[in-house]
Amino acid sequence: MAFALTWLPNALKAAGLKVEVQRGWETRGLGDMGIVRGVMCHHTAGPATGNMPCLGVITNGRPDLRGPLSQLGLGRDGTYYVIAAGKAQHAGKGRWQGVTTGNTNFIGIEAENRGIAADPWPEVQMLAYRRGVAAILGKIGVGAIMCCGHKEYALPLGRKSDPSFDMVDFRAGVAALLTGVQSVPSPAIGDSPRPILRRGAKGALVKEMQAMLGLPQDGIFGPNTEAKVRAFQQAQRLSADGVVGAKSWAALDGAFA
């Protein structure tokens, strides 16, 4: 029997986000959710490489903590992984806006990041984080204040440090999305915006990017292209996430002008 959060994939897709559902997600959970009151943000503190290396642990749990450990995972490339439609063990003891039953009333999002300065958050991932949270809060009809970080919820204060970014700024971005002020990032006047490219993309823009990087121009963003993109990003001191967004396009334009 499916649990209650079967609306999650459609809500995220409606916000223009990339979504992958995991096998068995509809019936996965430690019982059903209560009334969904908000969203709790986490980071995985996992490996330095890979798009979503902690997916298995989040899905199946650890020896000391039964899974699922959140309803959603968020990869470094901005992909949402729908893991569970039921309750997950992500919150623990704490309090936010009067809610003390985090596992029952908050949807958990585990975003892939080590949570240290050496692992900066990719722009594409942070944009997806804000948009995904806004999509969920809009669906349940509450404001941005009902998004909290694990570090804000957990008691005693200081028990948790995730997520590593500033939650006040994050909520401001979510609030802007909810009010329609910031539905999508706007390019500067005179810019010619180009879409974000990631593994799986195909077409003329992929060929253009491959030419800039000295790669065979087959127009397919596969693993070899991703590896070259990561190496270029690292050389340019950008987040080496293998995703070509606004900053990477600007760096490519500057390097190969």
What are these regions (language model features)?
Residues 75-77, 218, 241:
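Acidic/polar residues in short coil/turn loops that connect beta-strands
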Residues 176-223:
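Acidic, Ser/Thr/Pro/Gly-enriched interdomain connector segments
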